[in-house]
């Protein structure tokens, strides 16, 4: 069960997508909230669209059990059966970047389920194909090595740590070309209202600058 229904998810996603991550970062700072800016990752594609979604957390680590190669990986099964519209995959790969936590097939499956994007401190492969999907991603690296034999999913729907930020299930993730901002679900309304004030002020200043330059 999710905290918000589809209509509520759409409201928050569409409203947060109106703002750059810089406005959200400033809003959280103004409100005295802990920084939600994720550090140390990069956009898969500098031209990827701005996106927002609710954290669907997955924690992975180097595989300790044998994989028989027959069944779906646990990550694929979670994507196929537990994701829904408005989710944004958040995969903590315990800093492993020598192995790809996923690729184009998993991204396609997620996109078809209504997932808005992916955030991981691990690596991905099939980068060109994922970029062609217009599936927004922030990641820690790239690797052609597949994960099935070497990594396993050990937890889902738990708090994870990525880029210095604790991300809890249902936190809102906003990603654009500048970076990633995480807004705790308990503070969605106040952060959004503060971001509106910040953007309105910036727009007024920009208008004054343009008038002065004309």
Protein language model features and the residues they cover:
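Feature captures the catalytic cores and cofactor-binding loops of soluble hydro-lyases/lyases
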Residues: 2-169, 183-213
């Amino acid at each position: 069960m999710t905290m918000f229904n589809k209509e509520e998810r759409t409201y928050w996603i569409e409203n947060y997508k109106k703002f750059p991550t810089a406005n959200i970062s400033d809003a959280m700072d103004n409100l005295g909230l802990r920084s939600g800016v994720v550090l140390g990752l990069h956009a898969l594609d500098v031209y990827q669209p701005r996106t927002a979604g609710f954290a669907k957390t997955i924690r992975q680590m180097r595989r300790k059990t044998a994989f028989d190669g027959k069944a779906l990986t646990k990550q694929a099964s979670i994507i196929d059966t537990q994701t829904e519209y408005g989710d944004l995959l958040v995969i903590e790969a315990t800093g492993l970047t020598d192995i790809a936590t996923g690729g184009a097939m998993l991204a396609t499956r997620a996109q078809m389920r209504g997932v808005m994007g992916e955030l991981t401190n691990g690596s991905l492969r099939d980068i060109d194909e994922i970029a062609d999907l217009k599936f927004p991603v922030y990641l820690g690296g790239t690797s052609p090595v597949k994960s099935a034999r070497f990594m396993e999913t050990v937890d889902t729907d738990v708090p994870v740590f990525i880029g210095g930020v604790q991300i809890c299930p249902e936190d809102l993730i906003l990603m654009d070309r500048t970076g990633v901002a995480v807004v705790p679900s308990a503070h969605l309304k106040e952060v959004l209202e503060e971001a509106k004030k910040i953007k309105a002020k910036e727009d007024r200043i920009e208008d004054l600058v343009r008038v002065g330059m004309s």
